[in-house]
Every structure is written in structure tokens, then in C-alpha cells.
């Protein structure tokens, strides 16, 4: 598959019932610098002050501070990113961090007994790429895609019990299954070019560590679509789960009831 240049625009608007005195938000809205992904141009527009840094997982992040009264926050991230389709989903890692870091369960990916039983039917140690795709298919069969069925704080176990969820839940359940066997797996947040079909352009998938005859390293799998990552995907951040890779997380003082609207548009400029 040829390289794609993705045009991305991600708009987030927060509105508050009453004035907010102070807001602190962590933004992971700049695409990662990786082999096979290159930023051609990118900007983030918002009020307040931002301090940029690179976190322990190699993600670009901005700490946004609004230390004045406000009743809305507008955050717009946009630009062009050139993406190359990885060979068989393989993702050479430029961040010198042990994959064992991604074998530690979190609150969202804790492998409960129910998950262990499910995993035992669909996953084995030293699983191959095709076997991991089969696990993704089993997860999609067990947890049907339904927007609004879960919340950002929902655990993998909750999604499995409900039998429905979204890409975040599919990813968390896949990671939890890997944890049952000590297989490193990590959460990826980013964007997908939906093409000509209806699909949320903001997306989540996973990287999983494999050891095959000719390769030991990460491969990237879109659990929701049970396929390997291609050039249609732009990677924002990786982490142990949603909480450590979310595009926006924050706290505030005051404001009362909050409403949030999000609009994400992704397209291949060559299409």
C-alpha cells in the first residue's frame, strides 16, 4: 500500500454552566514521531498557556493551564501527516523502553476470572500474528460495537459482561487477555481515515509484542476491525490503557455542569 497523507482536524469544545476559576488539561494531540509516520505540518490552537514535553512512553504532550475565569474552552488540533503502511503490521519502536512495562495490569485492564476464562479459549503463549487477529475477531464477536454502551472509566471486565462497547473497550479487553499470559500489549490512541464509510475518525487500537522466527517486536492490530494497522491510521499516543494515552484529560475548579462536543475529520488528501 502506498504512503498516504492524511489531513486531520480535531475540534473539542467544553462549555460550563458557571465560570471556571482554574483548568489544567494534559493534551496528547500531536502525532507521534515514529518510523513510518512523519508530520508535514501541525498546530494546536487554544486559549491559555501550554508547556510541551515528551512523556515516558515517547508521546508528545502539552500541559494546558487556564488560570483565569472562563466558561468555555476551545481546542483545535489540525495538520497533515504522512503515513506509511507498516510491513505486516510491524512497528519498530524508537523509544528505548522495555516491553515488560506493558505486562502490568491497570484498573481498566485487570484480568478477572471471567477474562481469564475467555482468554484461555482464544489465546495461547507465543501466539502468531494470525492467532492474535483471531483473538480480535473473538472479542468483536463477544463484545458488539455499540456507541454509548460504556464510559471512558469502564473496565474490560464490564465490557465483556455487557457484551457491547466501543474501540476503547475492545482494546482494553485484548490487552487484559494478553496480561493473563504475560504478553506485552499497549493501548494506542489516534485517528483513522474512514474512507467512504461511516466511522468515527477518532480511534483506539493496540500494539502487541510477538516473537516469530524472523521478528521480535511490536505489531499493531485494530481490534475493532480485526486487522493490522495500515497507512490509514495516524498514531497520537501509546500507554498502558486509555488513561495514559487519552488525547485530552484534565481537572478544573468550579464551573458546575459541563458539556462537551467533539468533531473529528480525517481524509486522505490524495483520494
Predicted segments, located by residue:
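Linear, non-domain "peripheral" regions
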Residues: 1-117, 182
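Residue-level preference for alpha-helix termini and adjacent loops
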Residues: 19-21, 26-28, 63-65, 101, ...
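Hydrophobic/aromatic-rich core segments of domains that either
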Residues: 169-258
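Ser/Thr-centric signal marking residues that sit
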Residues: 12, 150, 224
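A generic structural motif
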Residues: 16-18, 124, 212
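Generic structural hydrophobic/aromatic packing signal, biased to beta-strands
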Residues: 8, 27-29, 44-46, 77, ...
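A broad, low-specificity signal for short, low-complexity segments enriched in glycine/proline
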Residues: 3-7, 34-42, 146-148, 164-170, ...
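Secondary-structure boundary elements
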Residues: 83, 93, 97-165, 173, ...
Amino acid at each position: 500500500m502506498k504512503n498516504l497523507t492524511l489531513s486531520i482536524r480535531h475540534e473539542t469544545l467544553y462549555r460550563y454552566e458557571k465560570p471556571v476559576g482554574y483548568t489544567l488539561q494534559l493534551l496528547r494531540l500531536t502525532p507521534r514521531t515514529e518510523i513510518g509516520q512523519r508530520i508535514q505540518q501541525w498546530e494546536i490552537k487554544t486559549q491559555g498557556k501550554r508547556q510541551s514535553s515528551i512523556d515516558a512512553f515517547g508521546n508528545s504532550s502539552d500541559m494546558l493551564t487556564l488560570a483565569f475565569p472562563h466558561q468555555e474552552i476551545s481546542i483545535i488540533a489540525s495538520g497533515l501527516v504522512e503515513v506509511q503502511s507498516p510491513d505486516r503490521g510491524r512497528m519498530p519502536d524508537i523509544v528505548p523502553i522495555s516491553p515488560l512495562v506493558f505486562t502490568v495490569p491497570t484498573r481498566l485492564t485487570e484480568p478477572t476470572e471471567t477474562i481469564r476464562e475467555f482468554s484461555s479459549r482464544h489465546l495461547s503463549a507465543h501466539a502468531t500474528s494470525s492467532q492474535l487477529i483471531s483473538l480480535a475477531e473473538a472479542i468483536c464477536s463477544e463484545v458488539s460495537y455499540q456507541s454509548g454502551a460504556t464510559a471512558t472509566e469502564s473496565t474490560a471486565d464490564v465490557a465483556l459482561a455487557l457484551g457491547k462497547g466501543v474501540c476503547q473497550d475492545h482494546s482494553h479487553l485484548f490487552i487484559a487477555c494478553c496480561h493473563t499470559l504475560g504478553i506485552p500489549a499497549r493501548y494506542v490512541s489516534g485517528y483513522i481515515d474512514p474512507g467512504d464509510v461511516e466511522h468515527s475518525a477518532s480511534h483506539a487500537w493496540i500494539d502487541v509484542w510477538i516473537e516469530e522466527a524472523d521478528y521480535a517486536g511490536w505489531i499493531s492490530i485494530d481490534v475493532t476491525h480485526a486487522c493490522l494497522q495500515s497507512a490509514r491510521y495516524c498514531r497520537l499516543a501509546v500507554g498502558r490503557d486509555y488513561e495514559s494515552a487519552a488525547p485530552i484529560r484534565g481537572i478544573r475548579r468550579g464551573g458546575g455542569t459541563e458539556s462537551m462536543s467533539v468533531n473529528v475529520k480525517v481524509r486522505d488528501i490524495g483520494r
